[in-house]
Amino acid sequence: MSKVIGIDLGTTNSAVAVMEGGESVIVPNSEGNRTTPSIVAFTKDGERLVGETAKRQAITNPDRTITSIKREMGTEYKVNIDGKDYTPEEISAMILQKLKADTESYLGEEVTEAVITVPAYFTDSQRQATKNAGKIAGLNVKRIINEPTAAALAYGIDKETDQHKVMVYDLGGGTFDVSILEVGDGVFEVLATRGNNRLGGDDFDEKLLNYLADEFMKQNGVDLRKDPTSKQRLKDAAENAKKELSTRVSTNVNLPFISAVNGTPVHLNMDITRSKFDELTSDLVEESLKPVRQALEDAGLSHNDIEKVLLVGGSTRIPAVQEAVKKLIGKNPQKDINPDECVAIGAALQGGVLTGEVKDLLLLDVTPLSLGIETLGGVCTKLIERNTTIPTKKSQVFTTAADGQTSVEIKVLQGEREMAADNTLLGQFNLTEIPAAPRGVPQIEVTFDIDANGIVNVSAKDLGSGKQQAMTITSSTKMSDDEIKRKVDEASKYAEEDKNKKETIETKNSAESVIYQVEKTIKDLGDKVSETEKSDINSKIEALKSILDSGDNKDIKAKTDELTQEMYKLSSKLYENNAQQPGASQEAKKDDDVVDADYEVVDDDENK
């Protein structure tokens, strides 16, 4: 059975893991790193860059570099590059394609199936968008699982037989989740989950960026945020300073030639202490504790009931974050696994469960938000409460609001507010051909069915006539199957283009190498190569050079082969020339004194 890989599609960094020999291992990317920046860039000549290469050129190409696209998943947001609109799903698919290709290179086999993680507090629209991104990238997404649950798997707490309660605090680059789980004997039951899809490491960077920009403006009267290149340099510096302050009490931000005042270059040079950084970001740390308190309340627990605290996400390296969690729960958080890698490791373990490679492990996750429909007066009537274990199915009977009503509009909502307008509209459909009757007489059964991915299916049935209508809630971006197929085809085309581009570069490099070797050999042989031979070879060299930039790999390879044959002839000439040198015969004479060893021919038949 083919491998089901585990992917942590992160806001700032992504990772991929796979089961090998019964263990979940991180797959290094083509650059040799264990995580890949979730960054996509388009160069001015149309080349598409993903990951490390995209990040390296961000300062010089900020307007065509896309970061933190995960925050826009499930929305109508578009990125316009050269007049073409890209959806968040498409950009995410480019990142997934890179992870897929790196894994295939690592394994030496094709990969088509994956488990992808999402923040526990992702809505149905965001989950569906993630699944669509996987489809565009050429992956069959076998399961969408919540990041905190995946992290809990990675910590290996399933190996403990005693039941105990665990809190997973997951602060990533762009999102925050907290989940309370009861685990033991291979069973993971999520009791409650809360979160904030707009809180993460990016916000900590932004606080420091704004402080640096404000201080610079006070001193020089220039707002660095108004220039894209200066802002990108400042952003990178803020991120690096944040990382350094996780292990040091102070750091220096030094950006020479960051701007100019009246034609004179000005530089930014500023010392930042950890205490200053903590002061700037204290409101963000406090903001992360609110969902923790809410999750404890939802689970009906106090902080004393929590036996283990797991920290997940790169932003949990911030000392103030660790201290705040420790102070609230009263326990030292576990830090015995890489917070950037544990989610992907857990996702691969879930992939192992699906293939049968990992046994005796059961995930019981929950839906993060309540689901319901709009009823008379614009009220949201909930059918499935938040923190209900999934998969789940719930039905409720409704009736008509007017005499003779022959159709009803079912508006599917997600959220905790009492009024429909204050919640997220996931989708709507009509149930028609209801027999006319006085209001209150028809019986319409509405059923919500949530699968293990957290994706919602809704149906409505008139119990009198048996008439039924159903729908699967799709992403709010409303990508149809045809649109997704078109995006898949485009992604495949790009993958083929990337492959062809690589082949073209390798073919050109090979040709240039042969040209160099031939020219060097001619030079080494000097006048031992006749002018006629030189002229013939040089004409072949020029013919090859003239088509190097044509992109015609077949022609380049053919002419390279011709030139290679000429190189072999020259090499033979070089060896012949060396053999005819006076020294060669002298060496032969010296060998006349060599004594031949005696030997006896043994007939094998005699020894049988």
Curated annotation (Swiss-Prot):
GO MF annotations in UniProt: ATP binding; ATP-dependent protein folding chaperone; unfolded protein binding
Keyword Transcription part of the UniProt annotation: no
SUPFAM superfamilies membership: Actin-like ATPase domain (SSF53067), Heat shock protein 70kD (HSP70), C-terminal subdomain (SSF100934), Heat shock protein 70kD (HSP70), peptide-binding domain (SSF100920)
Induction summary: By stress conditions e.g. heat shock.
Positions where Phosphothreonine occurs in the chain: 175
Keywords: ATP-binding, Chaperone, Nucleotide-binding, Phosphoprotein, Stress response
Function: Acts as a chaperone.
Family from the record: Belongs to the heat shock protein 70 family.
Name of protein: Chaperone protein DnaK
Gene field: dnaK
